[in-house]
From Swiss-Prot:
Stated name of the protein: Docking protein 3
One Pfam family hit: IRS
Main location: cytoplasm
Record's subcellular location: Cytoplasm; Cell membrane
InterPro entries, alphabetized: Docking_Protein_DOK, Dok1/2/3_PTB, IRS_PTB, PH-like_dom_sf, PH_domain
Length: 444
């Protein structure tokens, strides 16, 4: 029983098929039906036999003239496209109908007259193959040109990546292996199991030392402050470059949120344009007394030479005093070099070998416990102090005063031999000082 439906379009087409392993074209009579209460939208084709085309407009003369019927369901169509590269019969154009099951290559003298109604029935909501120019332009009249937002929802699109943990020293220590889900948050990277929403490890962006991707592997170096400890973590994924780019974008966004990180890095301090000038050692001058610094801040301007302070002579184990001390303090002046102070311990111990011929009684100490060998100018009493402005400025007068003190001390001890030695020593020193002509000065 023939169908009572009226086709939307019918006519002669050529359909490609395989015959003995070769591509061949055969003539078919095609009928295009629209969907309705009695059937679905479809394209039916019949083989044409023995040139049985009637004179009534390319229709078969009767049922006996028809061959095998083939049906293409338009609801299963995926695409309807022209096939310009295919070889087809003369004065025809080829077009390809692709369905969910297979593809059909057809040819017609006016292929566009077939493609447009097929597209209208197969894709009714799009209206891509609308034949009227007014219908095609009507939806475009109210269209406002707009651009795609490249960053819209980009964070959500690249938030989660399926990865496989690569074996490294850090992953072995953390007992990580197999597939995981790498989640990129706003502040950190989280590693989650595919079946559990809880994060196994998290690495804040500010604690990552390095990160990068190479040959399908995304890796980063974690710092000591991370929960997993420091080390290299590697994950293989076909979207490794996307993961690396997402991490770089997240770090850039986090840097913008922190004002202290957005500021320019601190510049080094400028070098000093000039340094304090130091004069050569030969040009150093003496500081005036009124500009003299505090004792804790005094700096030696010149080398005054060796000095020794007066010390209290204490007897050794054998009862003899240590060797004699001498101290000479000189002060260098810019104009004239003068002797500031000169003194010498002239006390000679006759009881000591090589200095005197005293007997053993000279080595015995007095009942008071203090050794008589110590000179009065070396003890800490106030009987003798450094010569100042109140004392005689004459050097000879100073030695006479020392002589009187020595004589008083020696007279109390009853040692005439010591007086003779002291006198001889003082005479020698006074004679030597008279020849030099010392200039009197005060002790600083």
């Amino acid at each position: 029983m023939e169908s009572v439906e009226t086709p939307v379009k019918d006519g002669l087409l050529y359909q490609q098929h395989m015959k003995f392993g070769k591509k061949c074209w055969r003539k078919v009579w095609a009928l295009l039906y629209a969907g309705g209460p009695s059937g679905v939208a479809r394209l039916e084709s019949w083989d044409v036999r023995d040139g049985g085309l009637g004179p009534g407009g390319d229709r078969p003369a009767g049922p006996g003239r028809r061959g095998e019927r083939r049906i293409i369901r338009l609801a299963d169509c995926v695409s309807v496209l022209p096939a310009d590269g295919e070889s087809c019969p003369r004065d025809t154009g080829a077009f390809l109908i692709t369905t969910t099951e297979r593809s059909h290559l057809l040819a017609a003298q006016h292929r566009q007259s077939w493609m447009d109604p097929i597209c209208q029935l197969a894709f009714p909501s799009t209206g891509e193959c609308s034949s009227g120019s007014g219908q095609a332009e009507s939806p475009k009249r109210g269209f406002v040109p707009m651009e795609e937002n490249s960053i819209y929802s980009s964070w959500q699109e690249v938030a989660e990546f399926p990865v496989v943990v690569q074996r490294t020293e850090a992953t072995t220590r953390c007992q990580l292996k197999g597939p995981y889900l790498l989640v990129l948050g706003q502040d950190d990277i989280q590693l989650r199991e595919t079946s559990k929403p809880q994060a196994c490890y998290s690495w804040p962006y500010r604690f990552l030392r390095k990160f990068g991707s190479d040959k399908g592997v995304f890796s980063f170096e974690a710092g000591r402050r991370c929960d997993s400890g420091e080390g290299l973590f590697a994950f293989s994924s076909p979207r490794a470059p996307d993961i690396c780019g997402a991490v770089a974008a997240a770090i850039a966004r986090q840097r913008e949120r922190l004002p202290e990180l957005a500021m320019s890095p601190p510049c080094p301090l400028p070098r000093a344009l000039s340094l304090p000038s130091l004069e050569p050692p030969g040009e150093l001058r003496e500081v005036a007394p009124e500009y003299e610094l505090a004792p804790s801040r005094k700096l030696p301007l010149t080398d005054p030479g060796p000095q020794s302070l007066p010390l209290l002579l204490s007897p050794t184990q054998d009862g003899t005093a240590s060797s004699l001390y001498a101290s000479v303090c000189k002060q260098t002046s810019k104009h004239k070099a003068t002797v500031e102070h000169l003194y010498e311990n002239v006390f000679m111990l006759e009881a000591s070998p090589g200095l005197s011929n005293g007997g053993p009684e000279a080595q015995e100490g007095p009942p008071g416990g203090r050794s008589p060998l110590g000179s009065p100018i070396y003890h800490n009493s106030e009987e003798l102090s450094w010569p100042g402005s109140a004392h005689d400025s004459n050097l000879e007068a100073q030695y006479r005063r020392l002589l009187e003190l020595e004589l008083d001390d020696a007279g109390g001890a009853g040692r005439p031999g010591a007086q003779t030695g002291i006198k001889a020593k003082l005479v020698t020193l006074l004679t030597r000082e008279r020849k030099k002509g010392p200039a009197p000065c005060d002790r600083p």
